[in-house]
Structure formats: structure tokens, C-alpha cells
């Protein structure tokens, strides 16, 4: 019973503290365009405070964004493609 109560309390907290992946957008609602992953790594980590980032389909895709950051709405197929980084 105690385990169940602990599970019910911890589960919502884990969802709140989780981080998300996606194309981080600026104040104009556009994701940074790119050709090189090094540019995206710097853009994601220094501008958007993500854990890392790389160039996916000519836009910077960031990993580990805070929940309050806005991301570009994309299709599930594109998201699953970009969630698997080719270059580390």
C-alpha cells in the first residue's frame, strides 16, 4: 500500500521535471536554420539552454529543453527521425 501511495506521488513530479526534445523557436516563432551540427550544438546549449543539439532536416533540433521553452509543432514521423541523432 505504501508503495502505491509513493508511486502516485512521485509519478506526477517526474512528469513535471522531465525535459523535452524539439526544434526550439525564437521570439518570432522560427527555428534556427542550419547546415552544420556544430552551429546547432552552440545554438541549443548557449541560446536555448538545452543539453545538446544537432542539425536535423536543415533546422536545429535540441535535446533536453526545459518544459517552458516553446518548440515547433512537427509530425510524429519527423520527430521520431530527429530523436535519433546520427552525429553525437
Swiss-Prot record:
Localization (cell): Secreted
Gene3D superfamilies in UniProt? Knottin, scorpion toxin-like
PROSITE patterns assigned to the protein according to its UniProt record, in alphabetical order = LCN_CSAB (PS51863)
Entry keywords, A to Z? Disulfide bond, Ion channel impairing toxin, Neurotoxin, Secreted, Signal, Toxin, Voltage-gated sodium channel impairing toxin
Q: Where is the LCN-type CS-alpha/beta domain?
A: 20-83
Provide the Gene Ontology terms for cellular component.
Answer: extracellular region
The residue range of the signal peptide is: 1-18
Q: Which InterPro entries does this UniProt record tie to the protein?
A: LCN-type_CS_alpha_beta_dom, Scorpion_toxin-like, Scorpion_toxin-like_sf, Scorpion_toxinL/defensin
Q: What GO annotations for molecular function exist for this entry?
A: sodium channel inhibitor activity; toxin activity
Q: Say if the entry is tagged with keyword Transcription.
A: no
Q: Give each disulfide bond as a residue pair.
A: 34-55, 40-60, 44-62, 56-82
| The keyword Signal belongs to this UniProt entry's keyword annotation | yes
Task: Spell out the CDD domains in the cross-references.
Answer: neurotoxins_LC_scorpion
Q: In which tissues is it expressed?
A: Expressed by the venom gland.
Q: Name one GO biological process term.
A: defense response
Q: What is its main location?
A: secreted
Family (UniProt): Belongs to the long (4 C-C) scorpion toxin superfamily. Sodium channel inhibitor family. Beta subfamily.
* Role according to the record: Excitatory insect beta-toxins induce a spastic paralysis. They bind voltage-independently at site-4 of sodium channels (Nav) and shift the voltage of activation toward more negative potentials thereby affecting sodium channel activation and promoting spontaneous and repetitive firing. This toxin is active only on insects.
Task: Quote the entry's note on domains.
Answer: Has the structural arrangement of an alpha-helix connected to antiparallel beta-sheets by disulfide bonds (CS-alpha/beta).
Q: What is this protein called?
A: Beta-insect excitatory toxin 2
Species annotation: Androctonus australis (Sahara scorpion)
Q: List the top taxonomic levels of the source.
A: Eukaryota, Metazoa, Ecdysozoa, Arthropoda, Chelicerata
Amino acid at each position: 500500500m505504501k508503495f502505491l501511495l509513493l508511486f502516485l506521488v512521485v509519478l506526477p513530479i517526474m512528469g513535471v521535471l522531465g525535459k523535452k526534445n524539439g526544434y526550439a523557436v525564437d521570439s518570432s516563432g522560427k527555428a534556427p536554420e542550419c547546415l552544420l551540427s556544430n552551429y546547432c550544438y552552440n545554438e541549443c546549449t548557449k541560446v536555448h539552454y538545452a543539453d545538446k543539439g544537432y542539425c536535423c532536416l536543415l533546422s536545429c533540433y535540441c535535446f533536453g529543453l526545459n518544459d517552458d521553452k516553446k518548440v515547433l509543432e512537427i509530425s510524429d514521423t519527423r520527430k521520431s527521425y530527429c530523436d535519433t541523432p546520427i552525429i553525437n
